[in-house]
Amino acid sequence: MPKMKTNKGAAKRFKKTAGGIKYKHATKRHILTKRTTKNKRQLRPNAILPRCEVAAVIRMLPYA
């Protein structure tokens, strides 16, 4: 059986850890002047993917 292909876009965005799948929050790149300090602070830490989306990401990352 041939090797399964990794979805390269997903590989750059998600990282599998013991606690789940880690990802970075969106809307934190540019044009941040209109965002409040509180909002920018809340987007700062990495987040764990919700359980309902884990299966789709695992399918894209067969060797993670």
From Swiss-Prot:
Q: Which InterPro entries match?
A: Ribosomal_bL35, Ribosomal_bL35-like, Ribosomal_bL35_CS, Ribosomal_bL35_sf
PROSITE patterns to which the protein is assigned, alphabetical: RIBOSOMAL_L35
A cellular component term, taken from the record's GO annotations = cytosolic large ribosomal subunit
MF terms (GO), sorted A to Z = structural constituent of ribosome
Any one biological process term the GO annotation gives: translation
**Pfam families on file:** Ribosomal_L35p
Highest taxon of source: Bacteria
Alphabetically sorted, this entry's keywords are:
Ribonucleoprotein, Ribosomal protein
Family affiliation: Belongs to the bacterial ribosomal protein bL35 family.
Q: Which HAMAP family has this protein been placed in? A: Ribosomal_bL35
**Name of this protein:** Large ribosomal subunit protein bL35
What's the source species for this entry?
Vibrio parahaemolyticus serotype O3:K6 (strain RIMD 2210633)
- The protein's gene is named rpmI
